[in-house]
């Protein structure tokens, strides 16, 4: 997900996106812990998407 796409969204949409990403991260961590996760790079992608969403939320708050 690109930062420009995130900046076009409203605060409520960003919060919903953040919640879904956090749920996805939890599911991926559980799969990784039980050795069911084939693509471990997905964890990195989700973690960085979460950081992007949080950054845009902070920018909009200022």
UniProtKB/Swiss-Prot annotation:
Domain of life (superkingdom): Bacteria
- Ribosomal protein listed as a keyword: yes
Q: Which GO terms describe its cellular component?
A: cytosolic large ribosomal subunit
Intrachain S-S bonds: none
Instruction: Give the UniProt family note.
Output: Belongs to the universal ribosomal protein uL29 family.
HAMAP family assigned: Ribosomal_uL29
Name of the protein described by the UniProt record: Large ribosomal subunit protein uL29
Q: Write down the species.
A: Chromobacterium violaceum (strain ATCC 12472 / DSM 30191 / JCM 1249 / CCUG 213 / NBRC 12614 / NCIMB 9131 / NCTC 9757 / MK)
């Amino acid at each position: 997900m690109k930062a420009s796409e995130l900046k076009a969204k409203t605060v409520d949409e960003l919060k919903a996106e953040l919640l879904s990403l956090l749920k996805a991260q939890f599911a991926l961590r559980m799969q990784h812990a039980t050795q069911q996760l084939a693509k471990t790079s997905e964890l990195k992608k989700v973690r960085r998407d979460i950081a992007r969403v949080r950054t845009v939320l902070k920018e909009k708050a200022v």
